[in-house]
Amino acid sequence: MSHYLVHLRDVPMIKKFVLGLLLLVALGLVGLNSIGITPAFIVYGPGVASGIGAKLLCSAEYVIGSERDQAFEDLVQYSPILSQISVRYDDAERAVTSSLFGMKEKTASFIPGLGCAVDYANYPQRSRLIVQQDEASSAPWPAGSAVSGIDPELQALLETLLEQDNSRGLNTRALLLVHGGEIKAEVYGQGMTSESKLLGWSMAKSLNAIMLGNLEMRGFLNLSDGPGFRQWSADARSAITSTALLTMTDGLDFSEDYNPGDDATAMLFTSPSSSDYVLARPLAADPGARFNYSSGTANLLSRLYTDTLGGPQAAYDNYRQQIFKPMGFQHAVFETDASGVFMGSSYFYASARDWARMGQLMLNGGVLNGHRLVSEAWIARATSPNQSENDKAYGYQWWLNRGNESLRFPELPEDVYYANGNRQQLVMVFPSQQAVIVRLGWTSGRYPVADNFARILEAL
């Protein structure tokens, strides 16, 4: 049986706990640090490790359809200690259970159309959602799945870049080019296809912003106003506007270090309601003054979307009718947490073609497939620098090349903006070139964005 199924499988729970503690002591501080165990990890790590294992392996199994060995290898890239988790797959229930040394066991379950989330007692909201599913369309992209405009020279270039990437261990899984509103080239890594639903991590933030822009266009909210969270009504956080949340200049005290015990890991992997976790965070700076990248803020935007529409079911239905269908998404899943609120910080799984639809919507000024989803004015604001004192090159959950004294990518056009996710996920929009480039993969280090994308632009 494979290694990820049998760690400490036959040891009773109490013995697992004791063995785990003895192992921590026996390894010593230097050895512990070398495999990812710090004093903070001893306190917070088991819950985080069990949560990330259950959640990511569940989605890999039942959303992506990854090979289990590959999914486990991807997981362990985050920390060597994750190689020590025990994992149990329950195909009958479509659930994955994980624990570290038998401690803090967590189970994530799959719901068709909703993907996976860690289960928590007394949080039935997600399981009660009525989910819609549609057959893929054979209409031409971006309305459907048909692609007929492949350019042989551009296709050959992307094939070369994919081969070069993966010969260097960059693990590129999809690379796609849209030019002039058509897919001109697309390539996929081993085991991946044009239908593979790939995790965008923080690129979900950019879709989250579009969803709020849609509500603003339809008159449901004014982004210049506050979000109206009752938890903030009696203190200084009431001064935070929805625009400050979109530009991550809200001033909330939220750490995004991804170490055990920090806010991001606690929110993502140990909290039944991600937005409730962030609603309790205090201010660390005056609203509007400083940019602080925060997945917590993104999940507050998801909460705003849900509250504005009247609850999880109404939010889900609105997303399906006003976003998913008009955009022509074919192979995409937006996961929620146990409370039924979209995980706007992290958990949108979609094919490369679906991710490209998001970029094309922005490039088209808010229109796709004959539907206006956001206003032109919203697009202009979303892609303009914020007014913070420390980092202006960020719009409404979209990264900007311009805004600071120097460009983020000096080799690329100044007007570029992009969605960006962990492991070097990218949807980059090039207005001057009328192009969108999508890159999906699992790269733990740097990716040659400027070099590769400049080569593609030169070939247009």
Placement of each model-derived feature along the sequence:
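Structured C-terminal helix/loop/strand segments within mature extracytoplasmic catalytic/sensor domains
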Residues: 37-50, 63, 71, 419-460
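Short, well-structured active-site flanking segments
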Residues: 68, 214-233, 255-256, 308-335, ...
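A short, well-structured edge-of-sheet supersecondary motif
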Residues: 98, 155-192, 427-428, 434-438
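Non-catalytic propeptide/linker segments at domain boundaries
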Residues: 99-167
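Active-site SXXK
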Residues: 181, 198-223, 245, 301-305, ...
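Active-site-proximal alpha-helical segments within enzyme catalytic domains
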Residues: 209, 296-306, 344-368, 425-441
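Active-site-adjacent helix/loop patches that line small-molecule binding or acyl-intermediate pockets
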Residues: 235-327, 352-364
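Active-site Gly/Thr loop motif
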Residues: 329-333, 380, 384-437
